[in-house]
Amino acid sequence: HIRNDGIVTIVLPHGVLFRGGEEGTIRKNLIDHNNIDAIIGLPANIFFGTGIPTIIMVLRKNKKDSDVLIIDASKGFEKDGKNNKLRACDIKRIVDAYKERPEKIEKFARRVSRAEIIQNDYNLNIPRYVDSSEKAESWDIYASMFGGIPEAELQDLSAYWTAFPHLKAALFSPDNEAYCRLNVANLKNAVLSHPDVVAFKTAFQNAFGDFDAYLKSVLIDGMTQLNAAGEEERLSREIFARLAGIPLVDRYAAYQLLDDDWKKIAIDLEIIQTEGFAATKQVDPNMVLKKDAEVQDGWVGHVLPFELVQNVKMHEEVAALRAKETRLSEIAGEYESHLDELSEEDKEQNFVNDAKDAFVAAEVKKAIKAREVEPATMSILKDVDALFAEEKTLKKQVKDDSAALHQRTKGVIEHLTDEEVRDLLHRKWILPLMENLNSLPDAVLDDFVKQLDSVCKKYETTFEDVESQIASTEHELMGLLDDLQGNEFDMKGIAELKKLLGGE
């Protein structure tokens, strides 16, 4: 039993939408009594143990309208092992469509009248009402024969031409009313430098120019008071509002970036609000499992990661340590170079291991002391011996420096000022999100250039060009065949091949 304004959601196999028998009767009754509010098609293989496509059917006891909202969310997911998984942006796209109940969202949702459903014999199969399929690639026969770029294929990019109204004329020259040609040498540079595209990027930068400061005021200044549970939704509305006047950028892609970042922000906020601001200056024992026993292996920041603190507050020490680690990598490469310099005979000596892929340190010293190798080999061995000594010293230094850096980082975190903590939280929470958001226009333009380049290159080589290349290759091969000599049977075979190539 449900209340008069109650809602029921049921997960069902996709087949219940169109099968006959008792399922068809139930479907008819639900439609006739105006109980189906929405049908949401989910990706296949989303539940463990079964790969069948499923739906969510939303039922209302007393609906105010008679339409059924049909959402095809089957294309929005990410792989999670063997299964498919809805991302945060996929879920929000579904929820927003359900709340807003639009007349139509291209390739995603549509509000269907009860009359249309009855006309279709109560068949609710989602593809009948929402076509989410991708357009199949086609080949223009005229362009394949004569070259040129079909206007019809350029119109598939109409959203970009609307956003960049003068770009198309700058890139293409018309051959006739149906075909055109590219008139720039470097497509990517021409697109990215065009005033319309520059204006697009500028508009995005202006929309988010003060977003860093906004996030800082909300998250950093208000970290102890804000409602973490509802803040993500508030921030998503702010992002959507800023994107309202920006074409092409998918607001749900921006939401996914926020959600990815919010996971760590929410955890930190909960710690700060429950344990106090002092928790940001706390370090915890890093407990690891060794031989079935839990033991401490150094320390971890309770809120602030060691790596972040090191990069910001101890960058000189980090740089010195990284330089030594880089040198160790270079030494490994120098070993390989010296191995390549050895003759095959030298590689059979004891100072090279059985796999012939490394020097043996002790045997290198013995060979140098014995002085029984050629001068060139002796020079190589002395260099290798020096590398062994340098490597040994560096490894000890790296180990000691890493331990010292780790211990000093613990002390730095514990003695941070409040202002330093706020700066580090800004770097942890806000800067990564801003960097990812600011990359969205570039991702849009990269995808546009890739699609445009594909269309332009599609008809670069015509059938006539291919035929000409084949004829040229056959002619060249004929010339080579004329120079061949052999016994009677070889020459008969060559003669027959020349016939096939059109030479006789």
PLM region descriptions:
Residues P305, K313-H315:
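Secretory/endomembrane lumenal or extracellular ectodomains immediately following the signal peptide
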Residues H1-W299, A320, R327, E336, ...:
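A conserved structural/catalytic subdomain of Rossmann-like adenosyl-cofactor enzymes
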Residues G301-V303:
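Extended alpha-helical interaction scaffolds
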